């Protein structure tokens, strides 16, 4: 899945007045101050962490067992402590593509948030080697959520609601710290067991304090909120807010329920699926319902309309899903028993396939 590129920079509180206009997402001085406090706390933590880095080669302390994941900027390994035998996950970032500051930032964000049960716990051990920076987290061994999503089908309803509830709680926790996650997608959700009972959010390299100025520099993806696709209200960009995460959560829930992306890009002029959704959202008429939405229940419609409101000030917060848990989110669950059995027996299949043409599949 293509990633989104962006530039971001801190924002001065004085730049937005209390109750700013909708183009600024309605950020108040109080909200921006919360973001600045989060930024200052992270700076202090980074300064301390820089002084306590362990300078050694990873192989001297840990033995590699197997790879757990690979990304554009680094890799994650399952390792064991050479003396104690403790299993750990080690994220390794090469120095040629990662600055010390970027490493310390991601490391410290993970440390500050990792007490939540739906966020991967980070341990306070940062390592500087000759060619890389590394830090340690709890190991989560059943892969990421994209491998569990069956294209054009999704997940069983109970699994969808469990995942959605846990991720919404994790995002609430992040927002309570004055931060915005900014990178919610199945690849950043780790699965703790074959039945997908528990999930954990990981990878905080894109997390930023609320109010940080953001400018999109690459093509949007389905999870990109539409306000980021519009011309920015200020030359520096758009001050980010938790509504960005609410939009991404809505897209993710749709993917889990259907096995489809609702659209490729949230741009009316280039994506007919997004245009169809906005027409239906505006009219509310059954005849305007886009085809991939046919099997969703009225409760799911209301939930997703709230999370996917194109206006950030009107968009419901991630906590809004609590009102819909326990209600049906699908009209019918075709092959539910078989799908649940497949989920338990083979969590590695699914999301690597891609539909060609028509509605984009997960």
From Swiss-Prot:
Q: Which InterPro entries does the record match to this protein? A: Kinase-like_dom_sf (IPR011009), Prot_kinase_dom (IPR000719), Protein_kinase_ATP_BS (IPR017441), Ser/Thr_kinase_AS (IPR008271)
What does the record give under GO molecular function? Answer: ATP binding; MAP kinase kinase activity; protein serine kinase activity; protein serine/threonine kinase activity
EC number of the protein: 2.7.11.1
Q: Which SMART domains match?
A: S_TKc (SM00220)
Looking at the record, which segments are called Disordered?
1-20, 317-362
Give all residue intervals belonging to the Protein kinase domain.
62-330
Q: Which reaction does it catalyse?
A: L-seryl-[protein] + ATP = O-phospho-L-seryl-[protein] + ADP + H(+); L-threonyl-[protein] + ATP = O-phospho-L-threonyl-[protein] + ADP + H(+)
Any keyword Disulfide bond?
A: no
Query: Where along the chain is composition biased (Basic and acidic residues)?
Result: 1-11, 330-348
The entry's keywords: ATP-binding, Kinase, Nucleotide-binding, Repeat, Serine/threonine-protein kinase, Transferase
Which biological processes are named by the entry's GO terms? MAPK cascade
Q: Name the SUPFAM superfamilies on file.
A: Protein kinase-like (PK-like) (SSF56112)
Which Pfam families does the record match to this protein?
Answer: Pkinase (PF00069)
Residues at which ATP binds: 68-76, 91
Active-site residues annotated for this sequence: 183
Top-rank taxon of the source lineage equals: Eukaryota
Q: Does the keyword Metal-binding apply?
A: no
What is stated as this protein's family in its record? Belongs to the protein kinase superfamily. Ser/Thr protein kinase family. STKL subfamily.
Kindly give the PANTHER family that the UniProt entry links to this protein: PROTEIN KINASE DOMAIN-CONTAINING PROTEIN, SERINE/THREONINE-PROTEIN KINASE SBK1
Protein's name in the database: Serine/threonine-protein kinase SBK2
What organism is listed for this UniProt entry? Answer: Rattus norvegicus (Rat)
Q: Which gene encodes it?
A: Sbk2
């Amino acid at each position: 899945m293509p990633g989104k590129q962006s530039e971001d920079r801190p924002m001065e509180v004085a730049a937005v007045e209390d109750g700013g206009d909708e183009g600024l997402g309605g950020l108040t001085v109080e909200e921006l101050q919360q973001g600045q406090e989060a930024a200052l706390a992270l700076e202090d933590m980074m300064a301390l962490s820089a002084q306590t880095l362990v300078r050694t080669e990873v192989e001297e302390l840990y033995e590699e067992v197997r790879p757990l994941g690979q990304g554009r900027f680094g890799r994650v390994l399952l390792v064991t402590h050479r003396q104690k035998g403790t299993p750990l996950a080690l994220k390794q970032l090469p120095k040629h593509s990662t600055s010390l500051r970027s490493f310390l930032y991601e490391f410290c964000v993970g440390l500050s948030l990792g007490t939540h049960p739906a966020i991967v716990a980070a341990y306070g051990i940062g390592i500087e080697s000759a060619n890389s920076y590394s830090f340690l987290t709890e190991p989560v061994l059943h892969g990421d959520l994209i491998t569990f999503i069956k294209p054009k089908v999704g997940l069983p309803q109970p699994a969808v609601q469990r995942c959605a509830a846990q991720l919404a709680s994790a995002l609430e926790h992040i927002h309570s710290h004055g931060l915005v996650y900014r990178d919610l997608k199945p690849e950043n959700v780790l699965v703790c067991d074959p039945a997908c009972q528990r999930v954990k959010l990981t990878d905080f390299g894109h997390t930023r304090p609320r109010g940080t100025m953001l400018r999109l520099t690459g093509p949007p993806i389905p999870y990109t909120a539409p306000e980021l696709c519009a011309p920015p209200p200020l030359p520096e960009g758009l001050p980010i807010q938790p509504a960005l995460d609410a939009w991404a959560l809505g897209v993710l829930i749709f993917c889990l329920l259907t096995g489809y992306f609702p659209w490729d890009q949230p741009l009316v002029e280039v994506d007919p699926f997004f245009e169809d959704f906005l027409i239906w959202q505006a009219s509310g008429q059954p005849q305007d319902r886009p085809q991939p939405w046919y099997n969703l229940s009225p409760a799911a419609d209301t939930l997703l309309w709230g999370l996917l409101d194109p206006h950030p000030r009107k968009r419901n917060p991630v906590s809004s899903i609590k009102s819909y848990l326990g209600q049906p989110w699908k009209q019918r669950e075709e092959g539910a028993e078989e799908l649940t059995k497949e989920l338990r027996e083979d969590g590695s299949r699914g999301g690597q396939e891609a539909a060609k043409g028509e509605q984009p599949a997960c």
